Amino acid sequence: MSIRPATHAGSWYSNRAQELSQQLHTYLIKSTLKGPIHNARIIICPHAGYRYCGPTMAYSYASLDLNRNVKRIFILGPSHHIYFKNQILVSAFSELETPLGNLKVDTDLCKTLIQKEYPENGKKLFKPMDHDTDMAEHSLEMQLPMLVETLKWREISLDTVKVFPMMVSHNSVDVDRCIGNILSEYIKDPNNLFIVSSDFCHWGRRFQYTGYVGSKEELNDAIQEETEVEMLTARSKLSHHQVPIWQSIEIMDRYAMKTLSDTPNGERYDAWKQYLEITGNTICGEKPISVILSALSKIRDAGPSGIKFQWPNYSQSSHVTSIDDSSVSYASGYVTIG
């Protein structure tokens, strides 16, 4: 048995079990969603240090429709340290350590998926992740303690649920569609849940992104006319701009959420890609989100209520007012199916 150590415990979050459990439990019970939300089978949530994003993150987990029939939870996260293309990397560990208890990896599913090939060239679509890459990445690990705390909160034994971590980097549209086809079969099974790990806008020169819009209408016009948004520079006169930078960031982030909420299911993937191209918004989990959108587009019979995105909470690490400032945005979302 190979156990992935909790490499970010003691830095990104507490390595003391009682302290960590109390912190996360407090976030969960303070979220206005007492949940679970019926048929909320996919959540989108941030992956920063818990003191920054924990309160927002908790809204996603409080909504998750956990029940005693759940057998597997997929966790999709972006890669922050390595670049790869047209493949999904899956954890090669059999167990994942957290200070609150360990989670078992669905190793049987790993063996099944690494046999899947891209029909165009026979290349494997799923590949085991090397241990160093796995241990360096925080986007997947930051979901684990919150998941364990939520399972305990819902009185579900850790022994009854397996997880399946997946790292996503750069895929072509065709590969996204191919992977979406595979994952859609698992989404159709209500005993599978999905966690998509993503922060929203990373704003500031240190992130090489200073996009600005003065209003929702201005952004809507840019999308319709396919013109890129303004990028602020040190020479930009902020007094000539309609709203403070932090409000502009929120306008762009909420437009991203609205794109996912309001676009018909079969058109979401393309609308999402267009939004990203026009705004350049630095949503670090844009690629895992794209994979999920591709998978959802394959689901033709989603029940009487269809597929719906909801966004119960949003926050920013700080309010940017100057070109010299920076911030990261956090959004909690859930997707109901049926």
UniProtKB/Swiss-Prot annotation:
GO CC terms of this entry: cytoplasm; nucleus
Tell me the domain of life: Eukaryota
> Pfam families given for it?
Memo (PF01875)
Keyword annotations of the record: Cytoplasm, Nucleus
Q: Which HAMAP family match?
A: MEMO1
Give the family, as the similarity comment puts it: Belongs to the MEMO1 family.
Mind telling me what this protein is named? MEMO1 family protein MHO1
| Gene (UniProt) | MHO1
